[in-house]
Amino acid sequence: MTIKVAINGYGRIGRNVLRAHYEGGKRHDIEIVAINDLGNAATNAHLTQYDTVHGRFPGEVSVDGDAFRVNGDRIRVLAQRNPAELPWGELGVDVVMECTGLFTSKEKASAHLRGGAKKVIISAPGGKDVDATIVYGVNHGVLKATDTVISNASCTTNCLAPLVKPLHEKLGLVNGLMTTVHSYTNDQVLTDVYHEDLRRARSATMSMIPTKTGAAAAVGLVMPELDGRLDGFAVRVPTINVSLVDLSFVAARPTTVEEVNGILKAAAEGELKGILDYNTAPLVSVDFNHNPASSTFDATLTKVNGTLVKVSAWYDNEWGFSNRMLDTAVALAHAR
């Protein structure tokens, strides 16, 4: 069954979802039928074709009246502020990828259902009212046919949860603290400007900027047995893409570097293949740009002192997450 997908909001994630679909050789039976964005269609086509972070799109993108042509496929382009007024029913949309960052609760995202869509995936942490928060590869099996609005969590939770799952299963995670060393994003500023968060008011290009994140705590939404056991914060740094999760945790029993690395290597080669990668080379952040994995565990950085464990994982915070949006869309559409 071909799953008809619409993208609402054509920013960093919206564009990368489309690119990932085509650059991945349409590995899923998905048809992107529409894009809704208030921006000029010609500008959005140009930004799809040419990207500072991910390079030139290896295909053709053009504007054809009220549509994009992407490698010959016609994708309807809309510019409607109110999701409830979008023609999702007319277009037969199965899943809307809600990528604006504006409709992040079930109540708000349900406007797409009133427009005729069957399901919605929010490309951000959702409110407590969403039907499920999903990290593909970790808990997508909980999806049910009755789920209509779900969250794809955050890029950081998508990196952290695949690390935590096998470690908790094999060692037991008592509690832990995470720092994400995170590239700057569009919710920061180029030069100092007023912001309620005084640190986020400062230039993203000039400083390391500590700020809050709910990514660690959100693991409890994905793995309820860990609810309340993880916390952390982010340090935004002056790089444009790729981030690093640094997790320190107390294990239920003493362990070793070799055992920890072995657990994650087995997971990367087994149940989490394609979601969790395993790295042993002395690499830096740019080497993981455009990597489709949610998380790349760096075995060279593991430290252990009895029951105290530190592990690290790289992630392309744009590309990996966008690939998981596609995976989750298929899982949601096929949920029974």
Swiss-Prot record:
The keyword Isomerase does not apply. Its EC number is 1.2.1.12. D-glyceraldehyde 3-phosphate binds at residues 154-156, 185, 200, 213-214, 236. Keywords: Calvin cycle, NAD, Nucleotide-binding, Oxidoreductase. Transmembrane segments: none annotated. NAD(+) binds at residues 12-13, 37, 81, 123, 186, 317. InterPro entries: GlycerAld/Erythrose_P_DH, GlycerAld_3-P_DH_AS, GlycerAld_3-P_DH_cat, GlycerAld_3-P_DH_NAD(P)-bd, Glyceraldehyde-3-P_DH_1, NAD(P)-bd_dom_sf. Pathway: Carbohydrate biosynthesis; Calvin cycle. It is an enzyme of class 1 (oxidoreductase). It comes from the Bacteria. The active site is at 155 (nucleophile). It catalyses: D-glyceraldehyde 3-phosphate + phosphate + NAD(+) = (2R)-3-phospho-glyceroyl phosphate + NADH + H(+). GO terms for biological process: glucose metabolic process; reductive pentose-phosphate cycle. GO terms for molecular function: glyceraldehyde-3-phosphate dehydrogenase (NAD+) (phosphorylating) activity; NAD binding; NADP binding. The record marks 182 as: Activates thiol group during catalysis. The keyword NAD applies. Could be involved in carbon fixation as a component of the Calvin cycle. Catalyzes the oxidative phosphorylation of glyceraldehyde 3-phosphate (G3P) to 1,3-bisphosphoglycerate (BPG) using the cofactor NAD. The first reaction step involves the formation of a hemiacetal intermediate between G3P and a cysteine residue, and this hemiacetal intermediate is then oxidized to a thioester, with concomitant reduction of NAD to NADH. The reduced NADH is then exchanged with the second NAD, and the thioester is attacked by a nucleophilic inorganic phosphate to produce BPG. Homotetramer. Belongs to the glyceraldehyde-3-phosphate dehydrogenase family. This is Glyceraldehyde-3-phosphate dehydrogenase, chromosomal. It comes from Cupriavidus necator (strain ATCC 17699 / DSM 428 / KCTC 22496 / NCIMB 10442 / H16 / Stanier 337) (Ralstonia eutropha).
